[in-house]
Amino acid sequence: MGAQPGEPQNTCSRIQTLFRRVKTLLIKAPPPPQPPPPPPSWNPGCTHVYGYAFGHMHDNNLEHLPSQQVLDTGEQLMVPVEVLEVDNKEALWKFLLSGAMAGAVSRTGTAPLDRAKVYMQVYSSKTNFTNLLGGLQSMVQEGGFRSLWRGNGINVLKIAPEYAIKFSVFEQCKNYFCGIQGSPPFQERLLAGSLAVAISQTLINPMEVLKTRLTLRRTGQYKGLLDCARQILQREGTRALYRGYLPNMLGIIPYACTDLAVYEMLQCFWVKSGRDMGDPSGLVSLSSVTLSTTCGQMASYPLTLVRTRMQAQDTVEGSNPTMRGVLQRILAQQGWLGLYRGMTPTLLKVLPAGGISYVVYEAMKKTLGI
């Protein structure tokens, strides 16, 4: 049978009608469902990079959060992001003063543990084992109760240059990497932080040597800081002020890597726990940074012990020490456990040092009106 004359036209009109109906349905149809939101991101208020405490990242900018803090574990003084982002000079000095005061009070409060750590690192051995209580008793018997704070004066004194150098060097590195505005990416923040720590440790290494000698001094050995420096220069020369520099620099690597790895692990744990990511408490931030810093200290502790032994070598044996020689001597006489002498007071002082510095820093900010 042939097609009817009007059939092609009817077919075209039907197709056009069908398209119009489909178009109408598409316009009236509800929008497609949105993809599920990404998992909540870590926001502890303090993204931590070796030597610094950063505010969390949001759209490549650093947000100022109330939980940002200074943290002094007795080994590393963290610089909070609010100090790094301040433009007003008056406010900047207030932040720096708050951080310096927090570090001074923290180190003074934990000075007996710090001296016990150095004492055990230098004098404890298999044949002359010294535990924490025994070390404290020996120090009190030799010099009285006040002797527990020997070396604390210079330990507090070096806070100001250490803090200022870290701040200044990081600012220069940040401006070099990404200009005056914006925040550098993670890798460049890590590099900037490590450079600042390395430079600050280079400049204050003589103060570290003086601190070790003054901490270990016997009653009447030195009249004070200047007399200690004079005797070292006269008997051992200027090179003695940089003893322990190499293990100190090498210790940055395991410290920083372990510190960041543990912090990232805590970050993942916090995200997977499904808790409120928007506003964790200051205690969570403080605990995370303290734990990661403690693990970093444990990873670099053998190098820290070698550094201390090299700095105190004149006090112990009167020879010119090398890193290799000190390490071989420790392993031969005490074994691998000898590389962790003094770890107990080191761990015991982390939590009180961090807590004291946090409380004092916040109190100083309120007092100074910032």
Curated annotation (Swiss-Prot):
Subcellular location: Mitochondrion inner membrane
Catalytic activity from the UniProt record: Mg(2+)(out) + phosphate(in) + ATP(out) = Mg(2+)(in) + phosphate(out) + ATP(in); ADP(out) + phosphate(in) + H(+)(out) = ADP(in) + phosphate(out) + H(+)(in)
Keywords: Membrane, Mitochondrion, Mitochondrion inner membrane, Repeat, Transmembrane, Transmembrane helix, Transport
Intervals holding Solcar repeats: 90-176, 184-269, 280-367
Topology of the protein relative to the lipid bilayer: Multi-pass membrane protein
GO molecular function annotations of the record: ADP transmembrane transporter activity; ATP transmembrane transporter activity
InterPro entries tied to this protein: Mit_carrier, Mitochondrial_sb/sol_carrier, Mt_carrier_dom_sf
Regions that span the bilayer: 96-113, 151-170, 194-207, 245-263, 282-306, 342-361
An example Gene Ontology CC term for this record: mitochondrion
GO biological process terms on file: ADP transport; ATP transport; mitochondrial ADP transmembrane transport; mitochondrial ATP transmembrane transport
Pfam families with a match to the protein in the record: Mito_carr
Function recorded in the entry: Calcium-independent ATP-Mg/Pi exchanger that catalyzes the electroneutral exchange of Mg-ATP or free ADP against an hydrogenphosphate and participates in the net transport of adenine nucleotides across the mitochondria inner membrane.
Family statement drawn from the similarity comment of this UniProt entry: Belongs to the mitochondrial carrier (TC 2.A.29) family.
Name assigned to this protein: Mitochondrial carrier protein SCaMC-3L
Naturally occurring in which organism (per UniProt): Homo sapiens
Gene responsible for this protein: SLC25A41
